């Protein structure tokens, strides 16, 4: 993506360096618009425009993200881990918020880019699947004593495991793809 005035205005709202040299689409996600920012020092960040069709409560979403990532940082530090690699790190705006709202009402957020990290869209083998489960279990363990009552429900029933499992079973029974 060309570093146009819009991108410069958006990035200038965050506590970032001044010498943005590149802004390119990043990843294969299909919900948010995601870009990798490169600065003159070689440092990278992730810039995301949140999809308001999916995330209709972006302020509440970002309160959740801020709370959970702060909690994870504390737990990771207590365990002697690397907080810049083991959890997302939000970059705040100059106003101290974890998001910026542009003149069109679009919500943007910035994270530190985790160098040399790997993200899989699909598992290649059983080991990948196993390691994903290990990572998810570790994530759950770190959040075991998180005050869940502080979280906002930003997508109805999204984290309701019972509801999701019921919907999955119904989809399997219907087998509309004839698998």
PLM features: residue spans?
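Juxta-kinase regulatory segment immediately upstream of eukaryotic protein kinase catalytic domains
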Residues: 1-24, 68, 72
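Conserved ATP-binding subdomain of kinase catalytic cores across diverse folds
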Residues: 22-177
């Amino acid at each position: 993506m060309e570093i146009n005035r819009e991108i410069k205005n958006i990035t200038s709202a965050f506590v970032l360096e001044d010498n943005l040299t590149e802004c390119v689409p990043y990843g294969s996600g299909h919900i948010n618009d995601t870009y990798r920012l490169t600065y003159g020092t070689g440092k990278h960040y992730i810039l995301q425009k949140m999809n308001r069709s999916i995330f209709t409560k972006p302020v509440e979403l970002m309160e959740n993200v801020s709370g959970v990532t702060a909690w994870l940082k504390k737990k990771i530090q207590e365990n002697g881990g690397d907080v810049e690699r083991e959890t997302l790190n939000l970059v705040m705006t100059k106003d101290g918020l974890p998001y910026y709202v542009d003149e069109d009402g679009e919500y943007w957020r910035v994270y530190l880019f985790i160098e040399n990290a790997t993200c899989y869209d699909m598992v290649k083998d059983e080991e990948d699947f196993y390691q994903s489960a290990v990572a998810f279990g570790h994530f759950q363990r770190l959040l075991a004593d998180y005050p869940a009552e502080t979280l906002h429900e930003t997508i109805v029933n999204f984290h309701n495991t019972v509801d999701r499992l019921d919907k999955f079973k119904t989809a399997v029974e219907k087998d509309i793809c004839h698998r």
